C-alpha cells in the first residue's frame, strides 16, 4: 500500500514537472505556446510575393459595382443605404433564402434601380464572386461564413467588406491578412461605431491633443439580446456563444478606442488578460431553445489590454443580463476625459481647447463634467471633417442614427477615388482576434496572452490615423 502511494506521489510530481517544463519550453498542443509566463500564438512569416497593405490604394473605380452576400438582418439595411450613394451599381443579391433576395429586389425597384442578379443557396456566393462585372463583395452573413466568402471573393479579384467580427479565430485573421496582401485587394471590416458622431469627434480631439496624452480607454458591447435571440436564423448566434468563451463581439467598443490610440499607426497592442463570470442567463436561454446543458460564454466578460506606448484598454461583453445598452467609449487623458455611456460628458483642462470654445467667464471643473454649453461648443469645434461633409445626409438616410451610412459612403468614396480605406485588413484582424485571445486567457486562469502583430513589424511605419480625401 505504501509503495502504491509512493508511486502515485512520484507520478503526480513528474506530471507537474513536465507541465512546468512545457510552459517554459514553449510546448503546447494548440496553435499557441507558453513562453516566460505568456501565451504566444504562432505568427507566420510573410510569404514570398506578399506585400504589406499599409497605406494601400487601389486604382480608382469611378462606378463601384457591388454584390451583397447575406440579406437576413444587416444586409437589407446596407442595400437600402447603397441606393442613396452616387456612383454605385448593385449587380448581385445573394442569400440562402429566396424571400430575402426578393425583399431586396423590391428595394432596388422602389429606388428606380435595375434588378440585380439573384443568387440563392449556401454556395451561391461563388457564382456571384466569379462575375467579371463586380468590384466589391459586401458580406453580412452569420459570423462563421465571413472568412470563407471573403477569401473566395479576394481570390477572384474582388475587394471585400465584412460585417463584424470579420473573423472568429486567430488563424482566420491571418488568412484574411495573407490573402489581402497576396491578391492586393482591400479587406475592410464594417465597424460602424468608429463613424458615430461622438466617437469620431473624440478621436479628432484626441489626435489634436485636447485630452493631453491618452492613458486609458474603455469600450464595451453591453446589450441585452433577450428580445432578439429568436431573430437569428437557426439560432446561429446563440449556438456560437454556447460553444465559445471570451469576448466574442468586441469590435463595437474596441475599434473606436484603437483608432483613438493610433493602433498599428505608431502604437500597437502588446498583450491582454481576460476574466469572465459563469453563465446563468446564457445557459438558461440555450437550454430552453436548444436543449443545451453547458454554455461556454460567461454572462459578463472583461478584458484588459496593454499597448506598446504604455496605455491600458478595458473592454466588456454582456448580451445576457438586464442592463441599459452601453458601449462605454471612455478616454482618460493626462489633461482631459471623455465619456459616452451611460452619460455623455467631457472634463477639460484650461488651455487645452481652441480659443472661443469656452464662453467668456465660464470655468472648468476638474472634478466634474463641463457644462452642456461647453460640451456642445467643443463637439462643434472639433467635428471631424468627414461629418462636416456628410452628417446631414447620413442622419436623413439613417442606419443606427447615420453612422452606418457614413461607413458605407466612406468605403465607396475611397474606392471611387483610389484612396486608402479608413479601416484596413490589419484593423479587421486586430479587432477580431480578441475573441480567441480572450477565450484562451480565461481558459488559463487569466494568463497574459500576446496580441499578434499582424503588420509583421510595420506597426510604426504610419504616423497616426488618417481619413484620406482627394
Predicted regions and their residues:
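Bacterial N-terminal signal peptides that target proteins for export
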Residues: 1-8
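C-terminal motif of bacterial Sec signal peptides marking the signal peptidase cleavage site
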Residues: 18-21
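N-terminal Rossmann-like dinucleotide-binding module
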Residues: 23-111
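C-terminal helical cap and adjacent loop that interface with cofactors, partners, or active-site loops
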Residues: 26-48, 54, 76-77, 258, ...
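A structured beta-alpha segment of the ubiquitous adenosine-cofactor-binding alpha/beta core
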Residues: 116-139
